[in-house]
Regions:
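Alpha/beta-hydrolase fold nucleophile elbow
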Residues: 192-206
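Alpha-helical packing segments of well-folded alpha/beta enzyme cores
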Residues: 32-36, 40, 79, 132, ...
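Cap/lid segment of the alpha/beta-hydrolase catalytic domain
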Residues: 93, 101-193
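Short, glycine/acidic-rich beta->alpha junctions
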Residues: 65, 78, 124-128, 184, ...
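Generic beta-strand/beta-sheet core signal
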Residues: 86, 146, 204-206
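N-terminal targeting or regulatory segments adjacent to alpha/beta-hydrolase or S9 domains
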Residues: 1-67
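Proline/glycine-enriched tight loop/beta-turn segments at coil->beta junctions
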Residues: 78-81, 88-98, 104-107
């Protein structure tokens, strides 16, 4: 019987494909890690052109148990990422930091533990771990929350997600949306000592 289902065909190709970068022990692990990192960087479409950060603080405010700084930083020429830095009160400095990356949902406000509507309230109620910043502060860590591309304030409407459109455009330019998000979250000049990363992605189905 002829197969007219293209998805079934592609799935068959996927199952029969042998990963080209699979580790088989024939070379030292560190050498394989270097090769894998180089290939992953290539597939993500990285690196992009570096630029001035032009960081600008929009506001700073004292809250119950922490100080919050809202700021933006330029990650590509003409593109700025909105961020929130929460520093817990009453801790000895310097302190460790958690980079909080929220996934599919309303936006980075979820990682801050802030609900903008009933859908957000349901999400935070069902998935407590998505409120990453409050947990980090409770553990004595600073929390840096950034808005991922095509999510929240960076989406078409300023709330929710708009990944599909952006992903198609990125592919046409030899880029990837995931590569763009990685680029926004990394800084080559920063040493990752005492910096943790926490990411959560879930789509709440009503």
């Amino acid at each position: 019987m002829k197969n007219y289902n293209s998805h079934k065909y592609e799935y068959g190709l996927l199952k029969s494909t042998k990963p080209s970068m699979g580790y088989d022990g024939s070379i030292p692990l560190d050498e394989w890690k270097s090769q894998a990192k180089s290939k992953l960087t290539e597939l993500l479409g990285l690196p992009f052109d570096e630029c001035e950060s032009k960081a600008e603080i929009e506001y700073s405010k004292e809250c119950d148990g922490y100080t919050e700084h809202r700021f933006s930083v330029q990650t590509e020429p003409g593109y700025y990422v909105p961020c929130h830095l929460r520093i817990p009160s009453g801790v000895c400095k310097p302190i460790p930091l958690t980079l909080c990356l929220s996934g599919h949902g309303g936006g980075m406000h979820i990682a801050l533990g802030v609900a903008k509507n009933e859908k957000d309230e349901a999400s935070l109620s069902a998935w407590h771990h998505r409120a990453m910043a409050p947990r980090s502060n409770k553990e004595g860590r600073a929390a840096l929350v950034i808005e991922a591309r095509n999510f929240g304030e960076a989406s078409l409407t300023g709330y929710g997600t708009s990944c599909t459109e952006a992903a198609k455009i990125a592919i046409l330019m030899g880029r990837t949306v995931i590569g763009e998000r990685v680029w926004d979250a990394m800084r080559i000049t920063v040493r990752p000592i005492r910096i943790a990363i926490f990411a959560a992605s879930v789509q709440l189905v009503p």
